[in-house]
Amino acid sequence: MNALMRRACCGALFPLSFRLAALSPMKGASNFSCGNVCASPAGCWAPPSGHDTGIKVYNSLTRRKDPLILADPTVATWYSCGPTVYDHAHLGHACSYVRFDIIRRILLKVFGIDTVVVMVVTDIDDKIIKRAKELNISPVALARTYEQDFKQDMTALKVLPPTVYMRVTENIPQIISFIEHIIANGYAYATSQGNVYFDVQSIGERYGKFNDSFSDTASESASQDKRHIRDFALWKTSKPEEPYWASPWGKGRPGWHIECSTIASSVFGKHLDIHTGGIDLAFPHHENEIAQCEAYHQSTQWGNYFLHTGHLHLKGNEEKMSKSLRNYLTVKEFLKSFSPDQFRMFCLRSKYKSAVEYSNGSMHDAVNTLHTISSFVDDAKAYMKGQLICQPVQEALLWQRLNETKVNVKAAFSDDFDTPRAVDAVMDLIHHGNRQLKAVSKESNSPRSSVVYGAMISYIEQFLEILGISLSQNQVAAEDRHSAVLFNVVEEMISFRSKVRNYALAADESPNAIGQEEKQQYKERRRQLLLEREPLLQACDIMRQHLAVYGINVKDRGNTSTWELLDRKEET
């Protein structure tokens, strides 16, 4: 009996009643373990066989960090819940998609794991039908409009597109077939009203992986035709003037949960590596997806890892950002004030699974972080060019800090994609780099340490590129001929201003002799020249202020001047 119990626990396809009995304590049965993790009464999670990537992810199925094990060490299958396209995407949606985009980039660029990502577009839904009626347009026209709008928003936020988008309405035959198979397996039933429901009681305690606090005392409402209150719709009979499709159960349309199960299974089959979505989708949506897929495939572990992002909420409001609560900011409205890179840094400053508060203060923290990085890179490049004269650099210490940073960042990424820890490690490196970039008036005879600063610049730019961020200076690179021309115009303008400024400061009036009398004469002459040339110096200062209005930050460094392009949205 112990052998049979072990097979039942580890997922052998015994009849359900036998499996449930085997999972119950039995008199005289010895203890055993099959290496599975049981986070709830809904069943056990078994580590998949395959390649251990060295990454640990917080798995909502087990409620702990598990090693990410893939059948193919270079490819992960990934299903992402996509938008229901009835309105503009808001910042809460954007936060979730940007966070998962960051994870996808880390998997590829740090660990060499490509991702095959399928995202569903729900283009038929109660909300779509309701909104279409309000606007007096067809549900199809509404859905296509906001689907394109969503894709434009994601492009603006630099979110990589999925490998493939799949619309619900283009998969209706597959959905009907999927439902028929679940019915044939004994896990769903059709009603006389033309509805089809999943029979939750048919899978017993396996239901409740994300929420096991159910009451079995509730009975079905008299206004509905399902057997039990927990049963959920796979197919819904159509109402007058609603879109419908013909089916074995009459005219109707699919339920919400069955769409994702069908589309994910049609691409990935009976095994899925990673499933993602917002934490609000864990129950009931992802719970029901799992129930449907395991009923269809006759398996006990369809998806191996479920990753969920935390809510984004406005400062002073604990409720998640939501259209239904009318406490949201659209992506388009947000991008009038801040840039995509600034929002991405905002997302990086918190763990992906944590709730995050949005406010002007939290956004300006992200803006300041990017500015600190950009300023350091600009100063380090000026040092390499000989434009910034500094005291001798402790080169060995900086090499040590750089190597430690690389190790710490890799460790942070391996630990459930801990981006706040990774960013902190890079900011600590910048702190130590800045400490040694202190300008001095005269250059010493000591050799300059350009190479270590070049290596730091290269690593920091690579770090940002991995995460999907571009430094502002790099964004000036010739996207087209006009950008290149403007770049050269600014270069010439700053060079001319630098020459005028040096003349106004009488920087070339230093005497060759160094006697006491000559020094005194030089000081007096320079004082007179500074008074005479004061209007030129004021004009240089005014030019710097005017250029700052257009996002051009001029830095005067002794006898030389450099510039960087800042995002004007930083001033908002």
Swiss-Prot record:
It is found in: Mitochondrion. A motif ('KIIK' region) lies at residues 127-130. It holds the Pfam family DALR_2. A motif ('KMSKS' region) lies at residues 320-324. Gene3D superfamilies: Cysteine-tRNA ligase, C-terminal anti-codon recognition domain, HUPs. One of its GO terms (cellular component) is mitochondrion. Its EC number is 6.1.1.16. ATP binds at K323. A motif ('HIGH' region) lies at residues 83-93. It is an enzyme of class 6 (ligase). InterPro entries: Cys-tRNA-ligase, Cys-tRNA-synt_Ia_DALR, Cys-tRNA/MSH_ligase, Rossmann-like_a/b/a_fold, tRNA-synt_1_cat_dom, tRNAsynth_Ia_anticodon-bd. It catalyses: tRNA(Cys) + L-cysteine + ATP = L-cysteinyl-tRNA(Cys) + AMP + diphosphate; 2 L-cysteine = S-sulfanyl-L-cysteine + L-alanine; S-sulfanyl-L-cysteine + L-cysteine = S-disulfanyl-L-cysteine + L-alanine; S-sulfanyl-L-cysteine + tRNA(Cys) + ATP = (S)-sulfanyl-L-cysteinyl-tRNA(Cys) + AMP + diphosphate. GO terms for biological process: cysteinyl-tRNA aminoacylation. Its cofactor is Zn(2+). Mitochondrial cysteine-specific aminoacyl-tRNA synthetase that catalyzes the ATP-dependent ligation of cysteine to tRNA(Cys). 'KIIK' region and 'KMSKS' region are required for cysteine persulfide synthase activity. PANTHER family: CYSTEINE--TRNA LIGASE, MITOCHONDRIAL-RELATED (PTHR10890:SF27), CYSTEINYL-TRNA SYNTHETASE (PTHR10890). Belongs to the class-I aminoacyl-tRNA synthetase family. This is Probable cysteine--tRNA ligase, mitochondrial. The lineage of its organism: Eukaryota, Metazoa, Chordata, Craniata, Vertebrata.
